[in-house]
């Protein structure tokens, strides 16, 4: 009951502060959805009553689970008490996050590739980054053998994510268990594991599981708990760290049963090392090679891209054409009577490059149904507007 008392205490304190100081108050509740886990009857109802009757207090509620947060606000708070406004805050800019990594761990992360992979893997989440960087600093200070940066961050990942005593291990476990304890929970866990192993569509999930039973209910549970997102007909796990935990921790445990410490660490490090190796392979390839690999993975899925919904056809043939006078490569993909034309720019394309690509597409037979511009660097605003006016999709290297 201590947690419930700790929550009730500041609620009781706010009116006293206001009457004594005659100043408005602000109450910030981070991850407010966890109020349900306190041993406090009708936590949201108690909170809502105070929101309604305390005009002198501003309540700021935050959550990293947007779907559930909006549902709670809409169904339990706003409907009864009103006065709630929902704001979606963007995450930390990746460039700012990279600067943070370099400034926080100059001695622990000397290899730029390690820092880049860390950011790509866990995303620009301030909490994930702060926990990781703190542990990397500790290991760097404790290491007298001058272990490599790769070894240090791999050990930090195990300590935080793979080890049952790690804080991020418990975070991932809690998120999955919340879904598993709901309706169709066992099916939801199996579907989540199938997606972590690469199943992107409902059909691919069925092929991995061997059954369609409770699939719709399981997917809905996962969406409600912000574990998966739907992009057209494709399903993704947006939290890459959680996906690694599923591959390296929950997957081996479901497959082999209880594992000793050494076997569990080996399974986790193998999963993470494979991700690291795959990422390094991709990053060492040219942008046009990465795009070609991506196009070869299309299997007639319908997805949401560039704020539009479209089908990704299975291509039968791809050919490239490099321009002599510019740092641009054209790639033409054909499949099922549908042609895509892509312009891959290793530098920043200007308006002339967009105009030239438009002329190239206009000369094609058959006419392309999709025109895509892929750039390594962000495009100039005028060039991007021209590309949009020509009905082109604009992708950056991170999209690949």
Question: What is each stretch, according to the model?
Answer:
Residues 208-225:
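Short amphipathic alpha-helical interaction segments
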